[in-house]
A protein has these predicted regions:
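S-adenosyl-L-methionine-dependent methyltransferase catalytic module, highlighting the catalytic core
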Residues: 86-91, 101-224
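Conserved SAM-binding loop
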Residues: 1-120, 135-147, 218-225
Length: 227
């Protein structure tokens, strides 16, 4: 989406550090924040010099006070896990370049597909609810509104993963038959790898259309701050 156009990347909730490693090897200036160093230390220890362990609210304030700016700020499956996402988004504005990009990926919950599955009784409950892990839930429209209230405009939304389409088929409905879950996941990976092999550009466009329709088990929004 932005390869070779922007060169400083902050990954909030960087986990094992794979995104840092990927862009570092392409020559980007990278930095990551996470509560724990376990993941990055055990998977990409060479990225530890570009890593800070701690509360992202505290660390973002330090960066803003130091005048640090980034071309890209990435929150991959972390915004919906945060207790204070509005504060985090406000702090991100202070460290994001005026023409910078904020990338956010979250689980697509209360999606149009999930609502349809409930309506047609293909699932028996709101299976996506997670009392401990998700303080916030977003679908496409909810994510766009949430970011707009924080002062960001949406440039694009992408839907990722076809796995929940399996719930439409009684033979592959992994909510009712958990034994098929592994094979559904493997099929999803194979399909996406095949699509990318055929055309990365067309695969990206398919994901964009999925996101536009509010489909996909996960959604990724591309935002810029209003200036």
């Amino acid at each position: 989406i932005f390869l070779h156009k922007l060169n400083t990347i902050l990954d909030i909730g960087c986990g094992e550090g794979y995104l840092l490693k990927y862009f570092y090897e392409y020559g980007y200036e990278v930095f990551g924040i996470d509560f724990s160093r376990h993941g990055i230390a055990n998977n990409n220890p060479d990225m530890l010099p570009f890593f800070c362990q701690g509360d992202c609210v505290v660390e973002l304030k330090k960066m803003a006070d130091a005048g640090k700016k980034f071309d890209v700020v990435n929150l991959d499956q972390s915004l919906d896990m945060m207790l204070e996402p509005k504060i985090v988004l406000s702090l991100c504005k202070n460290i994001l370049e005026d023409d910078g990009v904020l990338m956010i990926k979250v689980a697509n919950n209360y999606s149009v597909l999930q609502e349809y599955l409930l309506k047609t009784q293909k699932v028996d409950s709101e299976f996506w609810l997670d009392e401990e892990g998700h303080p916030y839930y977003f679908n496409k429209d909810g994510l766009i509104r949430f970011l707009a209230e924080a002062g960001y405009r949406c440039e694009n939304v992408y839907g990722e993963s076809f796995i929940d389409f399996n719930l439409l088929n009684e033979k592959t409905n992994y909510c009712r038959d958990k034994s098929v879950g592994k094979s559904c996941y493997q099929a999803r990976i194979e399909l996406e790898l095949l699509m990318e092999h055929l055309s990365e550009e067309k695969t990206l466009e398919i994901f964009r259309l999925l996101g536009e329709m509010g489909l996909g088990r996960e959604i990724m929004g591309v935002f810029k701050k209003e200036v």
